[in-house]
Amino acid sequence: MATTYRIAVLAGDGIGPEITAVALDVLRAIAPRFGLDFDFVPALVGGCAIDAVGEPLPAATLATCRQSDAVLLAAIGGTQWDSLPRHLRPETGLLALRSGLGLFANLRPAKIFPQLLHASSLKPEVIAGVDLMVVRELTGGIYFGQPRGIFTTETGEQRGVNTMAYTATEIDRIGRVAFETARKRQGKLCSVDKANVLEVSQLWRDRLTALSAEYPDVELTHLYVDNAAMQLVRAPKQFDTIVTSNLFGDILSDIAAMLTGSIGMLPSASLGESGPALFEPVHGSAPDIAGQDKANPLAMVLSAAMMLRYGLNQPAAAQAIEEAITAVLDQGYRTGDLMSEGCTLVGCREMGNLLIKELSR
């Protein structure tokens, strides 16, 4: 008897519906082999929700997500909503969704596919074999700390204020996710901070060091964030799992992303302590190519694979999808963002068809 999973599907804006269709087809194709069944429940978020009901995260969408086993999100946003007040913009809907689901840990892998070594701006010998994971704290730090704002001083001068703060509980929570993630990978965890000048980073380092006693099988190291950024570009193969705060993780995960050469190959997962996790590609909604069958669906498909591995505990099914992607790339098929001499250009739908063909072998 098949195991049925209820999946909230948030196709979103721009290329979102196109890449979502491919990911769902891939999941349907692989389901019978692993005794799985999916109940896909569509819901609105972002610009399409604003157009439909006047707000970026309808209450019905949050309710649907909370009642699901996992949430699969494509992309949100577009220039037509940029002039709206901040609280009505698509991006606010995503922040509210993360908050509403209690998601505090963001996992972003950066893995180099051998077939795409040429796509990176770094030398092949520098990036060949890179396979790392950035674990970023999502709900604390300087993006959420209070007080914040732009104030006028007694002398009439404007002063901008943001507060970077973490509690020991918040640090321990993300630290445990990072140690558990590293334990399932190569057993190496690098904690990134700025403990030489920031008290909040001193606490971060102290808490991670204390936690390491519970994970003797994981090797813990520490780097200052400026050095970590340099090392990611100089010698990225030294890293396995990186854990860091919200701001530093925002920056470092984008650096790690470009090691791969294409943001169109990067999935992500956002996890909470309980309840459904959120899985989405790193790239945006790319409205300039929406509806033209030019989008690269592979980051979305890899997000579906992450959902299987981290959200539904189906690692074998996840691996099968990843192996299908490798096989299709081995055969020389590329979407436009990955195209190089000697390869065969395919569109979004055809890339999906090739994956399904590979999965049916």
From Swiss-Prot:
Pathway terms, separated by semicolons: Amino-acid biosynthesis; L-leucine biosynthesis; L-leucine from 3-methyl-2-oxobutanoate: step 3/4
UniProt subcellular location: Cytoplasm
Name of one Pfam family that matches: Iso_dh
Sites marked Important for catalysis: 143, 194
Binding site for substrate: 98, 108, 136, 226
Gene Ontology CC entries for this record: cytosol
EC number(s) on file: 1.1.1.85
Manner of cofactor binding, per the entry note: Binds 1 Mg(2+) or Mn(2+) ion per subunit.
Biological process annotations from GO: L-leucine biosynthetic process
Disulfide bonds: none
Binding-site residues for Mg(2+), renumbered to this chain: 226, 250, 254
Coiled-coil intervals, chain numbering: none
Keyword Cell wall biogenesis/degradation: no
Residues the record lists as binding NAD(+): 78-91, 284-296
Cofactor(s) it depends on: Mg(2+); Mn(2+)
Membership in a protein family: Belongs to the isocitrate and isopropylmalate dehydrogenases family. LeuB type 1 subfamily.
Function: Catalyzes the oxidation of 3-carboxy-2-hydroxy-4-methylpentanoate (3-isopropylmalate) to 3-carboxy-4-methyl-2-oxopentanoate. The product decarboxylates to 4-methyl-2 oxopentanoate.
Protein name per its UniProtKB record: 3-isopropylmalate dehydrogenase
Gene label: leuB
